[in-house]
Amino acid sequence: MATLQQQKIRIRLQAFDRRLLDTSCEKIVDTANRTNATAIGPIPLPTKRRIYCVLRSPHVDKDSREHFETRTHRRIIDIYQPSSKTIDALMKLDLPSGVDIEVKL
């Protein structure tokens, strides 16, 4: 498996912390560029906002509510012309636990 011809690896990352996500993207792009693969990205995708509405009081006062939100930041990185060296380097890469990674070949 020297070189995969006309293939690409699509890496989809998502996290609640934007700075953590950006540092992970930089590590992946640097690793791909060091192994002579072309990395395109990170391409930012729309941020998902999830809002939770909670009653403040445990008893009455339904008019008094509190809103909480979580923001999920997402990025896509495409790696073209990956070699087996590229795949091995990506597998050994140490990324933070707050980042969710999905890889498609």
Curated annotation (Swiss-Prot):
Keywords, in A-Z order: Ribonucleoprotein, Ribosomal protein
Pfam families named among the record's database cross-references: Ribosomal_S10
Keyword Lyase belongs to the record: no
Gene3D superfamilies registered for this protein in UniProt: Ribosomal protein S10 domain
Gene Ontology biological process terms in this record: translation
UniProt family annotation: Belongs to the universal ribosomal protein uS10 family.
PANTHER family named in the record: 30S RIBOSOMAL PROTEIN S10 FAMILY MEMBER
Protein name in the entry: Small ribosomal subunit protein uS10
Organism: Nostoc punctiforme (strain ATCC 29133 / PCC 73102)
